[in-house]
């Protein structure tokens, strides 16, 4: 007996982009936010070609933008329009607020890609309990 696996189709995939002050940091001529935007655009394009649903969430101290995951042809254009208007904010990002909003708004099993920067391992460890990790 041999198990055969099929790739999942139409899986919701969300790019979650932190627009807080830590993403303003420069790296090789671009800000970390610029790299997050470029990566999320490239990944969204590939996912749409593979017939997955893609969505976008941007946040800092509050949720700034939410685009529900969808596989429509116009979805990449909507993502580009949302990303064009993203700028870094000065307040620190509120991960507790982010995770509570994600639990309410995303009820289907989804792939979440978080674009952020933790300046120290201690900053990462402070945020893990909010994500349900010990």
Identify the function of each model-found stretch.
Residues 24-26, 79-84, 107-111:
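A generic short-segment signal for beta-strand/edge and adjacent turn/coil regions
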Residues 27, 51, 71, 87-90, ...:
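Short coil/turn residues that cap or connect secondary-structure elements
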Residues 1-74, 111-115, 129-130:
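An amphipathic, basic-hydrophobic helix/alpha-beta surface used to engage anionic
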């Amino acid at each position: 007996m041999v198990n055969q696996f099929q790739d999942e189709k139409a899986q919701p995939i969300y790019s979650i982009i932190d627009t807080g002050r830590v993403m303003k940091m420069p790296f090789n001529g671009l800000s970390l936010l610029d790299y997050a935007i470029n990566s999320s655009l490239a990944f969204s394009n590939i996912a749409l070609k593979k017939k997955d649903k893609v969505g976008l969430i941007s946040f800092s101290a509050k949720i700034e933008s939410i685009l529900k995951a969808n596989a429509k042809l116009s979805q990449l254009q909507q993502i580009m329009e949302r990303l064009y208007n993203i700028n870094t904010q000065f307040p620190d990002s509120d991960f507790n607020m982010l995770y509570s909003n994600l639990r309410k708004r995303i009820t289907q099993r989804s792939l979440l890609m978080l674009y952020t920067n933790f300046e120290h391992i201690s900053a990462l460890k402070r945020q893990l309990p909010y994500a349900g990790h010990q």
